[in-house]
Amino acid sequence: MKLKDTLNLGKTEFPMRAGLPTKEPVWQKEWEDAKLYQRRQELNQGKPHFTLHDGPPYANGNIHVGHAMNKISKDIIVRSKSMSGFYAPFIPGWDTHGLPIEQVLSKQGVKRKEMDLVEYLKLCREYALSQVDKQREDFKRLGVSGDWENPYVTLTPDYEAAQIRVFGEMANKGYIYRGAKPVYWSWSSESALAEAEIEYHDLVSTSLYYANKVKDGKGVLDTDTYIVVWTTTPFTITASRGLTVGADIDYVLVQPAGEARKFVVAAELLTSLSEKFGWADVQVLETYRGQELNHIVTEHPWDTAVEELVILGDHVTTDSGTGIVHTAPGFGEDDYNVGIANNLEVAVTVDERGIMMKNAGPEFEGQFYEKVVPTVIEKLGNLLLAQEEISHSYPFDWRTKKPIIWRAVPQWFASVSKFRQEILDEIEKVKFHSEWGKVRLYNMIRDRGDWVISRQRAWGVPLPIFYAEDGTAIMVAETIEHVAQLFEEHGSSIWWERDAKDLLPEGFTHPGSPNGEFKKETDIMDVWFDSGSSWNGVVVNRPELTYPADLYLEGSDQYRGWFNSSLITSVANHGVAPYKQILSQGFALDGKGEKMSKSLGNTIAPSDVEKQFGAEILRLWVTSVDSSNDVRISMDILSQVSETYRKIRNTLRFLIANTSDFNPAQDTVAYDELRSVDKYMTIRFNQLVKTIRDAYADFEFLTIYKALVNFINVDLSAFYLDFAKDVVYIEGAKSLERRQMQTVFYDILVKITKLLTPILPHTAEEIWSYLEFETEDFVQLSELPEVQTFANQEEILDTWAAFMDFRGQAQKALEEARNAKVIGKSLEAHLTVYPNEVVKTLLEAVNSNVAQLLIVSELTIAEGPAPEAALSFEDVAFTVERAAGEVCDRCRRIDPTTAERSYQAVICDHCASIVEENFAEAVAEGFEEK
């Protein structure tokens, strides 16, 4: 036997290298085979409910890192709730209707307008479901736990029926109406868009300054006067029916030198406009208040059949332009509102594809709207005063990335204005984890217009509306519920398969259809109405969930999307918000803080991370960032997170190895019998348990990460485990001192594994498989550790906090001695302490082997004053010299008692007593040489 064999060197097969990319799928298959998700739900039956309702990602393509961050965050919350006494099922979902899928099929060569619609919709459905399957595997590979076999999908008959019923309730309350208001119109999608489908980009446009000649000055202006107008959308002049001025803005009538014409502009802008137009020696003839110009009539710049009326509008400013805007009610919300108030014609001169129509005039007909500027300039002639290119923020279709226009077309609307205050009142009752989120949603609802819910597309849920022979729209409870039942039984494709009369209840009649003839609506619903109905299609309809849901968690873009549409439909139906809490996240940016895009080549696919590092590293990364704001991710950042993971793993490996001979049922030492330092570590760890439990409850992942890493690095590695080897390796295997420390090791190991489970389930299960004395076969079926209360815990914490200060001072003294070449390692030191009464009392209270805690071979508490050479602090001073004696071959301490023993071992008296007591046979035979 060799002397080293008398040491209790920790033994474990738990590998240092995690091998996550290959091991994770093995664990995941084991969980699936064991029906772990279902077992967890059964275990929690009857406990308080917690419903995190999954916002449905769009079923198109593999998931990106933003999806991963979102789903991992949800998984951490649901797992922590499940381990904290809550029944917390998780039903993942997918959003499956809409334009992107139509675009994919178009790229694949499918021609929608050349094939049977029902066949086309079947292709859309098949593609959508294939993407659901693809993303389901992506999410499962992240280790996300949920009811993957029974997700919700917005194209299933039960969901579509629930959506129709949401619409029906809104129709019954009078919240649905048809109107021809201007809406966001995407010529690239050939459809109306909701606000949530708009994103803003910078666009360079040609802006024109031109003049309308006064036709009837109403006794205020002469007919040789021209009103100067500014526009950034020249194509809309073809539909201009008025000029809007600000009632309280001052306008001036001016005549530049050498110019026969007189012009009207805003007084505040005269100087800048004179420079722009090249006007010199401008004479101000008169000043008018805007309201004095009301109802003056001007000529259209080129269309002699059209008169343009001067009207008043609150939206006119003097921030730019001329203080006067032309008004085309068919092409803008403000224009429409003031136009209707003044009985202006709502002219629309652009078709659904962005092509100028016949009513725009023969010179314009057939041109794309963006290309008409040269024709407009030609038509304006000498009425054009200036033109310039401007860059401004402009709305784009978020899917096609093409600019959109405002365009008045008959659409179906949900009247938010009828119940706006109810919605705002409900927002006040919701808990927002970011106060700015509440303000943002509140302001959006307060300021938004009515919701255009109709779309001129094919792949979506039909609007359940019929038309009588006289054109009356029919949407009554009887017909809508009948359609809902048909959808529930056959799916929404039946709308396209059957004639209108076969979609109505048997025997249905209407006074507007004396001949019994009916037509059906061909528009479909906005996809935000699809996902915005999920509270009904899922949360209400699934018995395991509770409505309103406890939490909605999505990206911050969903304040204008899913948070918004869900809130509107839920309040419209039931008068309550669909969620009790909202937690929003920022976007995942690259390592430099730039937005990720394929064109820049700076994207990170979750699958690439899984192959290089493993999903655990992505999961740990999610907790390492403040996801309430935009976050950064790169392979370098993940590499740093991987180092943190390695530190966590190796620390826990040390605990596993050094409790391998510990049976908790037989070897646990009662708390009251622990050494002071072990009690301290137990209490410190209990503080960590509380911090982490509280942070899980508040969804504060970064707090968990920081607290965990700090505990492992500072409390364990830099202190407790630093001197632990002097105990667990050196002392007798069954000695009280070793069992005391193992008791703490094992307690921390078991509990920290449970605390880590929501974040690192793969690693936690791997550790758990080495804990043979724990009863649950999976750690995921256990509960998070409870926070305990210990006698005198505050006093113990105060004592050891003071000791840590003392230890820091001692380490400075040792460092100085090391720099002066007095010692090499700290074990070579004899440390003499010159304490005042406070420190002396402290060291007595610590009641421990202080030399062992400081990892020095000898420590002396001296009486009297410290020598001049000592390193002095306020309460204590230190001197350091080399310890007397020889190095013990077993414990490596320098000890005066170290000597060669009769059994061929050069060891100190302390080690000799351990060896002689525990290894009598080896002592009798003598040890082998080193």
UniProtKB/Swiss-Prot annotation:
Binding annotation for L-isoleucyl-5'-AMP: 554
InterPro entries: aa-tRNA-synth_I_CS (IPR001412), aa-tRNA-synth_Ia (IPR002300), Anticodon_Ile_BEm (IPR033708), Ile-tRNA-ligase (IPR002301), Ile-tRNA-ligase_type1 (IPR023585), Ile-tRNA_ligase (IPR050081), M/V/L/I-tRNA-synth_anticd-bd (IPR013155), Rossmann-like_a/b/a_fold (IPR014729)
Motif ('KMSKS' region): 595-599
Gene Ontology annotations for the cellular component aspect, listed alphabetically: cytosol
Keyword Nucleus on entry: no
Domain notes: IleRS has two distinct active sites: one for aminoacylation and one for editing. The misactivated valine is translocated from the active site to the editing site, which sterically excludes the correctly activated isoleucine. The single editing site contains two valyl binding pockets, one specific for each substrate (Val-AMP or Val-tRNA(Ile)).
NCBIfam families per the UniProt record, alphabetical: ileS
Name of the protein in question: Isoleucine--tRNA ligase
